[in-house]
Amino acid sequence: MSRLIVVCIVISMICGALSLSSTKMADEKKEKDEDEKPKISGGTVIAAGRLTLDLLKTLLGTLGSISRKIAIGVDNETGGLITGNNVYFRSGTSDDILPHRVETGEALLYTARKTKGPVATGAVGVFTYYLSDGNTLAVLFSVPFDYNFYSNWWNVKIYSGKRNADYDMYHELYYDANPFEGDDTWEYRYLGYGMRMEGYMNSPGEAILKITVMPD
């Protein structure tokens, strides 16, 4: 009888050790998988196939608890290289450097936010990229501070030749060049120069903007 009890105790100890070992191995595998997951951050370039609305929401979360912020993804399907030029901010700022080289089949990620502190600003600006044909792609984003008077807006335009983002470009894209309201709707537009675009922006103060530029 005593031998049976000893055998049972030994078996129980072995099973416990195996269970603990399996749990440890599972935890180590989970940690390894997490480490191997491609990290996302603003100011980077990813494969275009990875650019989804969910990825932009994840990117938005990296900015922390800021009430006015935006995560932007632009999928380059133009057939050529696009080269980052400059950013103009009407309000707010960014912690990112505009990605410099985005090959066709790649997507750029960029984030912007309101200025930190108790200041009544949103995240509003324009950035530009030079296309391989020598023209300029401009992207407007606008996440206002006060939703009693304003809404989210965005726009995309191709300018002839090389242009810098500045106040005049912002003013044209926001007021005159038929901007799109960020109202959770997909939009489509012919851009000229043999290109067209499709894009989506949502309506909250924590916004995402996804744009694809492609041949017409």
Swiss-Prot record:
It is found in: Secreted; Nematocyst; Target cell membrane. Its main location: secreted. Residues 142-157 are annotated as: Trp-rich region, which is important for the binding to lipid membrane. One of its GO terms (cellular component) is pore complex. Belongs to the actinoporin family. Sea anemone subfamily. The partial protein sequence of PubMed:14680802 corresponds to the N-terminal amino acid sequence. The record marks Y150 as: Important in the initial contact with the lipid membrane. Keywords: Cytolysis, Ion transport, Membrane, Nematocyst, Secreted, Signal, Target cell membrane, Target membrane, Toxin, Transmembrane, Transport. Phosphocholine binds at S91, V124, S142, P144, Y170, Y174, Y175. Residues 40-49 are annotated as: Plays an important role in the hemolytic activity. The lineage of its organism: Eukaryota, Metazoa, Cnidaria, Anthozoa, Hexacorallia. This is DELTA-sagatoxin-Srs1a. One of its GO terms (biological process) is cytolysis in another organism. Residues 48-67 are annotated as: N-terminal region. Residues 1-19 form the signal peptide. Pore-forming protein that forms cations-selective hydrophilic pores of around 1 nm and causes cytolysis. Pore formation is a multi-step process that involves specific recognition of membrane sphingomyelin (but neither cholesterol nor phosphatidylcholine) using aromatic rich region and adjacent phosphocholine (POC) binding site, firm binding to the membrane (mainly driven by hydrophobic interactions) accompanied by the transfer of the N-terminal region to the lipid-water interface and finally pore formation after oligomerization of monomers. It comes from the Eukaryota. Octamer or nonamer in membranes. Monomer in the soluble state. The keyword Membrane applies. It holds the Pfam family Anemone_cytotox. Composed of a long N-terminal alpha-helix and a core region rich in beta-sheet structures. Before the pore formation, the alpha-helix binds the lipid membrane, partitions into the lipid-water interface and stabilizes the monomeric molecule on the membrane. Finally, it traverses the bilayer, thus forming the transmembrane pore. Residues 20-38 form a propeptide. The keyword Cell membrane does not apply. InterPro entries: Actinoporin_PFT (IPR050677), Anemon_actinoporin-like (IPR009104), Cytolysin/lectin (IPR015926). A motif (Cell attachment site, crucial for protein stability) lies at residues 181-183.
